[in-house]
């Protein structure tokens, strides 16, 4: 069964891709990760004080929270317009949501990785042996459980800037749709 009018398939595809890009932003997940990083930073000690007291860390948190809020407002604008501009064409702001949303996802996972420090990198027996010996069998990885799992979303979300149309392609779409270049 055909979706949409005959010979208008590309218009339907662009509309669907715009919706996909809007969803890829995953702002709720980024906010959740930033909140988790703040919780971790309250419990993690660095230089004799809680990491959350570090001015640089707090500035990164504040910047991320501000950017997430700004993108949430942009997302509401795009969604309330049905993903289309007044002229009926797909809203190019879905590309902005995709680009900035994936950058925020990556930055939020970097924040968690930084809070975990070296405990974020899982240690395997071979690597531990190279450092001077193997742990006893079934010995847990040192540090809190969350730290050993921090690397997985960090590494996986490097791909977020590629799937759904790479961020570079999205920038080209914006250049054409918004600037007319």
Report each predicted region and the residues it spans.
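Glycine-rich beta->alpha junctions and the first turn(s) of the following alpha-helix
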Residues: 1-71, 160, 176
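Glycine-rich phosphate/cofactor-binding loops in nucleotide/flavin-utilizing enzymes
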Residues: 2, 7-27, 119-181
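Secondary-structure capping and boundary motifs in well-ordered enzyme cores
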Residues: 5, 53, 63-67, 86-93, ...
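Tryptophan-centric aromatic hotspots in well-structured domains and transmembrane helices
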Residues: 10-13, 40, 66, 73-76, ...
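Alpha-helix N-cap and coil->helix boundary residues
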Residues: 52, 56, 73, 107, ...
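C-terminal helix-coil-helix/basic helical segment that borders enzyme active sites and/or dimer interfaces
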Residues: 69-140
